[in-house]
From Swiss-Prot:
Places the protein is found: Virion
Gene3D superfamilies tied to this protein: P-loop containing nucleotide triphosphate hydrolases (3.40.50.300)
Entry GO MF terms: ATP binding
A GO cellular component annotation in the UniProt record: viral capsid
Annotated positions binding ATP: 16-23
Entry keywords, A to Z: ATP-binding, Capsid protein, Nucleotide-binding, Viral genome packaging, Viral release from host cell, Virion
Major site of localization recorded for this protein: virion
Keyword ATP-binding belongs to the record: yes
Database matches in CDD domains: TrwB_TraG_TraD_VirD4 (cd01127)
Keyword field contains Acetylation: no
Encoding gene (name): IX
Protein name: DNA packaging ATPase P9
Length: 227
């Protein structure tokens, strides 16, 4: 069965507890973007090594604003840099036609007005989004309700499964829960992939390895900017 990938206006929410392959899958989605035609920003609150290993990405300060295509990685400190992140997101909202990757959605406060504006208005402004979270119960509801695609890995907490359950047409408890010493129906590194617009839901096999995903990026010589 052929499955669709998010286009340059759509957003995907990638969920899963630590160690499920969530970040590798999200970076795999990111690797499919055309950085020669569009700028993407990455909010790497957790300092994820896989993200920081992308060759050719620009590592920039929070006061930097992209003016040309490419990949720009920011490293905000949770709580400390919240105001700067809000201003950055407002500026992206005003500029439009820039992709946004958020390494952990709950690192942005639930009521952040700029984040909510991107989630609710980003489609019309050509602002696609890739949002990750290991705890969907802590996410703003708009991150879930406004998603065009879901990729859901194993979620260990029942509250997280219940938070997402109303948005996907499969029984998450049945797929993710299993008696002691048995294997859940949703295998390791496999995920539930749901295309909301097409109402198409499949079990996706593991994405390529981290090294293979990193090799997909073609961004030229790696450099860091402090502006």
């Amino acid at each position: 069965m052929t499955i669709r990938m998010p286009n340059d206006r759509q957003r995907i929410l990638v969920l899963g507890k630590t160690g499920t392959g969530k970040t590798c899958a999200a970076v795999w989605h990111l690797s499919q973007k055309d950085f020669k035609r569009k700028a993407w920003i990455v909010l790497n609150h957790k300092g994820d090594d896989l993200i920081d290993s992308i060759e050719g990405a620009n590592h920039v300060d929070l006061n930097f604003r992209p003016k040309k295509p490419g990949l720009y990685i920011y490293h905000p400190i949770p709580d400390v840099d919240d105001a700067e992140v809000t201003q950055l997101l407002w500026d992206i909202h005003a500029m439009g036609d820039i992709g946004v990757y958020v390494d952990e959605g709950y690192m942005i406060p639930n009521r952040d007005p700029a984040f909510q504006a991107l989630l609710t208005q980003g489609r019309s402004k050509k602002i696609p989004m890739i949002i990750l979270s290991q705890r969907p119960v802590w996410l703003t509801r708009f991150a879930i309700s406004e998603s065009d695609f879901f990729q859901i890995f194993q979620l260990g907490d029942q509250r997280d499964r219940q938070t997402v359950q109303g948005f996907v047409p499969v029984d998450l408890e049945k797929l993710m829960q299993a008696p002691v010493n048995t294997v859940p129906a949703l295998k390791k590194f496999h995920s539930i992939y749901y295309d909301v617009g097409a109402n198409n839901c499949v079990i996706m096999t593991p994405v390529p390895t981290a090294d293979a995903v990193l090799a997909r990026f073609d961004l030229g010589k790696k450099r860091k900017q402090t502006l």
